[in-house]
A protein has these predicted regions:
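Positively charged, polar, low-complexity stretches
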Residues: 1-102
Length: 102
């Protein structure tokens, strides 16, 4: 798993930023495919904070998929509401960071 500890205040800040985002990546009937993770990496590298929408998954499946995405996608699962989940990965290059956490 991506090991970057966030404080409660930082997670609250990121959830606030995430409210205005549209879902960047969608998980369909195919589940967590290599193509999904390629898209996930592309969007995380560009934006750092993304929303993932679960199209064909019930509540239990969504609860199981979100930690798997965080683990395999090397990112942090911030929160889930309904059929969407919010993920964050800070860019290792300080010059390319989109979101500054304090």
């Amino acid at each position: 798993m991506y090991d970057f500890p966030l404080t409660g205040a930082q997670k609250t800040f990121l959830r606030g930023l995430g409210q205005t985002l549209d879902a960047s990546v969608k998980v369909g009937k195919g589940g967590l495919t290599p193509e999904f993770f390629t898209e996930l990496q592309k969007h995380l590298n560009a934006r750092e904070l993304i929303k993932v929408r679960f199209v064909a998954a019930d509540r239990d499946e969504r609860a199981a998929l979100a930690p798997q995405i965080a683990d395999k996608g090397r990112c942090i699962w911030i929160s889930s509401v309904g059929a969407t989940a919010l993920f964050f990965r800070q860019n290792p290059d300080p010059a390319r960071r989109v979101i500054e956490l304090t």
